[in-house]
Curated annotation (Swiss-Prot):
The modification Phosphothreonine is found at residues 503, 772. Residues 1055-1212 form the PID domain. One of its GO terms (biological process) is receptor localization to synapse. A motif (Nuclear localization signal) lies at residue 934. It comes from the Eukaryota. It is found in: Cytoplasm. The modification Phosphotyrosine is found at residues 900, 1006. Residues 575-587 have a biased composition (Basic and acidic residues). Disulfide bonds: none annotated. The keyword Repeat applies. One of its GO terms (cellular component) is cytoplasm. This is Ankyrin repeat and sterile alpha motif domain-containing protein 1B. Isoform 2 may participate in the regulation of nucleoplasmic coilin protein interactions in neuronal and transformed cells.
């Protein structure tokens, strides 16, 4: 080694003495130590001494090495001997670049100030980066401060056109960003078309940096060729940044250079994050549209207040309205204050409830009494002309939902608790489904009802199913000029006003949970009402008795109403109905919450959760209402079966200011409404009516539909006629037209409870009502008809309620079903993917992930489909209710998949016992069933199976092919039966079974052992039996070099089962820089050192079971068998034994959430077991890789195993499994591993011993 190399090495290692010695001969002459001529000895020492600026092969000088390694004293010494600070290495880096990159502020100052050679702070490397770029990128704020003080130019851009501010924003260096924008605020306006600091920070999800940039004055809507910062945040799934940008007021409609908006980009990249971001965007767009509507309404309100002239009859109500308006104005101010200060939603609801109820109670009854019998003006009951209705619409402070909800809707927390978006519309034409408001009688009959009106509206809005509603008031063209109110659900009305904003597609977590939280604060009464419609009290206004029809369609509630044909009357009291479905749902939720926790200590296995797949977690369905079949039936039915009084319509009497009212005493009728769309007839809904008689039995509620009854009867396997008199009577009444979609029958017990409650209330109101003679005669006729058919109808409907079998004929096609829920555009999506029959699309068949996979990206539409599916019959699994098909053909015909019969038979699935053990992987790769709907139908029909029960294999096998092409299983060691690991538990019993199967497969009479049909025997004899196979490359061919030629296990072992090993879990370590096996070695050394520090630490080491399959590695607590975590095979990058202790091994996983790598370290019971685990991991990846290739070749890229569900644009990487020998051992130790089952070659057997290290690297 020459002196130059010695100097470089001394500078790198920090050997100050050696540097001093090597450079000491230069001191006197070079720095002018003497004035006379230099002695000859000194000149010779200079000639022989090292060059202080000498470089190595990378271009590093001694000063580079010292600056990079932080040797301050050597830097000073080198500068003292005139080392140059302005020599660049091969990549153009100067010593100041390296010091800044390292973050050593002292060395940076020395290089700048010490001399005699001074660093130039604006020097650039080959990538045009300055030292400020290096320091800013790695967040060295002290170095950045020094460089900025030295007037480093922060506008210099590197070869990627990035400034130091860009790099700091890109990597989230918050302090550096603050320092640079404080020193040079003009940098935020110096942007390129490629990027801006805001775009870079948004792309990587640095929320704090985004906020700092925006607060510093950066334009939130600045654009690049990729669009706005919102495009970047949405594309990379940064939900928090999207929220910040939207709150700042970014324009969500900006388009990128390709003309795409943010929503367009989200549609191109479907994922869970995309759905969340799309929901935020839609909420933002809806809020912006609503705010504009509020401003417009306020402007119209001012104009209307100046020009409107009220009649004398309206003046009393106007006085009261002004009083309420004054109080509500204070309330709205408090709501806005809540919004600004981000108060909790409970505080806001208390404000609404207390303020409104307290102030409305101040309105004295005397004031109402002064009105006499005059017709007063209210927002829902007054007889108004069309012009007056329009004026009233523009009053945002009225007692209706308009003013209150427009102020309340944007409040934080409203959407989370289930408040729908309410938008008021104005329609010039008559609606198809109006809620007709009848002319008002005297208001003094019920002076206290208005007090609860606002809360009733709030309660009603809150308790609807989670959907977006539109409440629209429209002028009525009827002769009595009564106003109309139509409340429609999306998808059911074709008259939506295009001026309203888009309806949010996201659904709140649970309507019943929201109701439970909200009713308590909005309506604090002794008896809380939990009805889905909150007991329709606001129609108890004596002047407003109309018929309500609550239709439940796919979880969304729509109110439609029509006048009922009945004689005039004064009032009828309303029956309260409690929603027991909500209480049941809450009970279900409580049961789930009360589930006992797992017994293992979470702290011991905390490291395993890094990079763990959420597959072990059971997702909690927020819609508890649809959790079980009973809830699925009862909840929606009770929403649609709310008991309401018989509607009475007051006949308008012209030329008479005071209508004459004659009291009658009718029997109160409880109505049960069933809806069924009939495409051949008009959408008539027939209402079955039961008379309430004291002392009579409490029968079931029932309903009939003349248009759809025969169809329903066919569904249930029986066709019968209905008495014509009953149909004619109901048709003549023309009660309502419904846009509802599904027949709903309540369960027997629930219906009887409801009937009992309603009968009690009806009997109490019977004495307070009278009937006119004509009305009496009509109902007497009804009574006779009811008595004649009562028993037959009830017994028949009891059979309907008890019927649980699958319908024998389809109720409707998929297209008709989708049209009924307002989503006909998805018919091709469902049909093309196997969801082609409504009978086989129940909740145990179709899931949200299925809809996402087939291309339904809109979360609101998926939610609507899933809620409608809850109302469809579930598939009947084999064995349910005695259903046991005797053959495969019979079973396939029963689920309408008879076309697959031949595929099942030729692949050996000849009996139902074999079918009950089939797995979805076999359906994809063996039976080639590519339609996900058909696969889900098959699995749902087979029912639930135990996970621990291995599937029975049909007479076919996935063979392991040797390089010679012979289709034989791997040759195992003859001493397999002797290699029993009593401690490790790794004896592979299925190997013996596999050998027997292989022998049978080689026997030409193999198929004679299995009972089969004539068709099967013919196919076996003619050679038509297809034997699908998966070919694994042997280890020595799949890797660069290895002494092993055969894998440890048969591939089916890793596909249908798993290989379980016991080991000790030592812990995990964060890998800052991924360096393959070096990283695993460092982690193993660190974990061993931690365990050796104390015996107490060793006692805490838990024992786990590693369950290895082609999907990945599951971690099972050996104590209680609970699954702790699961690492997918695609996230495992490297596995290796520790060279210092071969019984210790580790592998590296990637945590997808944090994007960090973690190394998990384990200790096996012996060296052999550690080697076997590492080899099994390599084989698991090879199996998964071959399965993925086979699935892709077969055109099933959308149905790959879950471990390979990557984006289609990325090719599947070829695995690099390297099992290499790194240590040669003494031949005397060769016999140690002679009996291992994976040792198959005697020649190779003698080449490996106990001290051999094997590594499996999987990338």
């Amino acid at each position: 080694m020459g002196k130059d190399q010695e100097l470089l090495e001394a500078a790198r290692t920090g050997n100050v003495a050696l540097v001093e010695k090597l450079l000491s001969g230069r001191k006197g002459g070079i720095l002018g130590g003497g004035s006379g001529p230099l002695p000859l000895s000194n000149l010779l020492s200079i000639w022989r001494g090292p060059n202080v600026n000498c470089t190595d092969s990378s271009g590093y000088t001694a000063l580079h090495h010292a600056a990079l390694n932080g040797h301050k004293d050597i830097v000073l010494k080198l500068l003292q001997y005139e080392a140059s600070t302005n020599v660049a290495d091969n990549k153009g880096y100067f010593p100041i670049h390296l010091a800044a990159w390292k973050g050593d502020v002292e060395i940076v100052k020395i290089l700048i100030h010490h001399g005699p050679s001074h660093s130039r702070v604006n020097e650039q490397n080959n990538e045009n980066e300055t030292a400020l770029h290096c320091a800013a990128q790695y967040g060295h704020s002290e170095v950045v401060a020094v460089l900025l003080e030295e007037l480093t130019d922060p506008t210099i851009r590197n070869s990627k056109l990035e400034t130091p501010l860009d790099l700091a924003a890109l990597y989230g260096r918050l302090r550096v960003v603050k320092m640079i924008i404080s020193a040079h605020p003009n940098l935020m306006s110096c942007n390129t078309r490629k990027h801006t600091p805001l775009h870079l920070a948004a792309r990587n999800g640095h929320k704090a940096v985004v906020q700092v940039l925006l607060e510093a004055g950066m334009d939130v809507s600045c654009q690049t060729e990729k669009g706005s910062a919102l495009h970047e945040a949405a594309l990379f799934g940064k939900v928090d940044v999207v929220r910040v940008l939207l709150e700042t007021g970014i324009d969500a409609n900006i388009k990128d250079s390709l003309g795409r908006t943010v929503l367009d980009i989200l549609k191109e990249h479907p994922s869970q994050k995309s759905l969340q971001i799309a929901t935020l965007l839609q909420d933002y767009l809806e809020g912006a549209g609503r705010s504009a509507a509020v401003l417009e309404e306020h402007a119209q309100e001012d104009t209307a207040q100046e020009t409107h002239l009220s009649s004398p009859a309206e003046s009393p109500q106007k006085t009261k309205s002004e009083t309420v308006t004054g109080e509500l104005s204070k309330l709205l101010d408090e709501i806005k204050l809540c919004q600004e200060k981000d108060y909790s939603f409970e505080d806001l609801c208390h404000t609404i409830s207390d303020h409104y109820l307290d102030n409305l109670s101040k309105i004295s009854e005397e004031e109402l009494g002064k009105n006499g019998s005059q017709s007063v003006r209210t927002s829902s009951t007054i007889n108004l002309s069309p012009g007056e209705v329009e004026d009233e619409e523009e009053d945002p402070n009225s007692c209706g939902p308009t003013g209150l909800w427009e102020a309340l809707t944007p409040c934080n927390g409203c959407r989370n608790l289930g408040f729908p978006m309410l938008a008021q519309e104005s329609y010039p034409k008559k609606r198809n489904f109006p809620m007709e408001m009848e002319p008002s009688a005297s208001l003094d009959t019920f002076p206290s009802e208005n007090e609860n009106f606002l809360c009733e509206l709030v309660d009603t809005a809150v308790t609807k199913k989670p959907c977006s509603l539109e409440i629209a008031r429209a002028p009525s063209p009827r002769t009595d000029n009564a106003s109309e109110v139509a409340i429609t659900a999306p998808g059911t009305s074709h008259h939506r006003n295009s001026s309203t904003g888009p309806t949010p597609d996201c659904s709140p977590p649970s309507p019943d949970t929201a109701l439970k939280n909200i009713v308590k604060v909005i309506r604090p009464q002794p008896k809380q009402r939990t009805s889905i419609v909150s007991s329709l009290d606001f129609q108890r206004m004596n002047h407003n008795q109309e018929y309500f029809e609550i239709s439940t369609s796919t979880g969304c509630t729509s109110f439609t109403s029509s006048p009922a044909a009945s004689p005039p009357t004064s009032s009828v009291e309303t029956t309260e109905v409690k929603n027991e479905g909500a209480e049941h749902a809450d009970d279900l939720s409580q049961q789930e919450d009360d589930e006992p926790p797992k017994e293992y200590d979470a702290g011991q296995f905390a490291g395993l959760l890094h990079g763990s797949s959420p597959a072990c977690e059971s997702p909690e369905n927020p819609f508890h209402l649809y959790g079980k079949r009973n809830t699925c039936e009862d909840g929606p039915d009770e929403a649609s079966l709310a008991n309401s009084p018989l509607p009475f319509k007051q006949t308008p009497i012209e030329n008479n200011p005071e209508p004459s009212v004659k009291k009658v005493k009718p029997k109160v009728v409880s109505r049960t409404i069933f809806h069924k769309r009939n495409h051949q007839l008009e959408n008539h809904t027939i209402v079955g009516t039961r008379m309430s008689r004291s002392g009579s039995r409490n029968g079931d509620q029932w309903g009939v539909n003349p248009g759809g009854f025969v169809e329903r009867a066919c569904t249930l396997g029986r066709i019968r006629s209905l008495p014509k008199a009953l149909i004619d009577m109901h048709l003549s009444k023309n009660v309502s037209k419904s846009d509802s979609d599904l027949i709903a029958y309540p369960s027997k017990d629930k219906a009887r409870v409801n009937w009992s409650k309603s009968s009690t209330a009806e009997r109490s109101s019977k004495d307070n009502s009278e009937r006119t003679p004509s009305f009496t005669s009509e109902w007497e006729e009804i009574d006779k008809i009811m008595n004649s058919i009562d028993v037959g109808i009830n017994s028949e409907l009891e059979g309907m309620n008890g019927e649980t079998t699958r319908p024998r004929c389809p109720v409707q096609t998929v297209g008709q079903w989708l049209e009924s829920i307002g989503l006909p555009q998805y018919e091709n999506h469902l049909m093309a993917n196997g969801f082609d029959s409504v009978q086989f699309m129940g909740s145990n068949v179709m899931e949200d992930q299925d809809l996402l996979e087939i291309g339904i990206l809109n979360s609101g539409h998926r939610q609507r489909i899933l809620q409608a599916i809850q109302l469809l019959p579930k598939m009947r699994p084999i064995g349910h209710d005695g259903y046991h098909p005797t053959s495969v053909a019979e079973w396939l015909d029963s689920i309408e998949l008879g076309d697959y019969t031949k595929a099942f038979l030729i692949n050996g699935y000849t009996s139902m016992d074999l079918l009950k053990k089939i797995w979805e992987l076999e359906l994809i790769n063996v039976l080639k069933i590519s339609l996900i709907g058909h696969r889900k139908r098959i699995l749902a029909s087979l029912g639930d199976r135990l996970h621990d029960d291995p599937p029975q294999k049909p007479p076919r096998s996935i063979t392991l092919r040797e390089p010679s092409g012979n289709h034989t299983p791997p040759q195992l060691s003859p001493s397999l039966s002797q290699s029993t690991y009593t401690t490790g538990g790794s004896l592979d019993v299925p190997h013996i079974i596999m050998q027997g199967d292989a022998r049978r497969r080689r026997n030409e009479n193999y198929f004679d052992d299995i009972p089969r049909s004539k068709l099967e025997r013919q196919m076996a004899q003619t050679g038509d039996w297809g034997e699908p196979s998966i070919t694994l490359r042997p280890p020595n061919e799949a890797t660069a070099s290895t002494p092993v030629q055969y894998w440890q296990h048969h591939p089916e072992k890793l596909i249908f089962q798993s290989c379980d090993y016991k080991a000790f879990y030592l812990g995990s370590m964060l890998i800052k820089e991924l360096r393959g096996t070096e990283s695993t070695q460092d982690a193993c050394a660190k974990m061993r050192a931690n365990c050796r520090k104390s015996t107490e630490q060793m006692k805490k080491v838990p024992t786990i079971i590693l369950s290895v399959s082609y999907k990945g590695v599951k971690f099972i607590d050996a104590a209680n068998k609970n699954i702790i975590a699961e690492h997918e095979i695609r996230n495992i990058s490297c596995a290796a034994q520790d060279p210092e202790d071969l019984s210790t091994f580790a592998y590296i996983t990637k945590d997808l959430k944090s994007n960090h790598h973690y190394c998990h370290v384990f200790t096996a019971f012996d060296v052999n077991l550690a080697y076997e685990i590492i080899l099994t991991l390599g084989q698991a990846f090879e199996v998964a890789y071959q399965l993925a290739l086979q699935a892709r070749k077969g055109g099933h890229s959308s149905t790959l195993p879950e471990s390979f569900e990557n984006k289609p644009s990325k090719p599947i990487p070829k695995p690099r499994v390297s099992i290499r020998k790194s240590v040669q051992i003494d031949p005397s130790e060769q016999k140690t591993l002679a009996n291992l089952p994976w040792i198959v070659e005697p020649g190779q057997e003698a080449k490996r011993g106990i001290n051999t290290k094997y590594e499996t690297t999987i990338f």
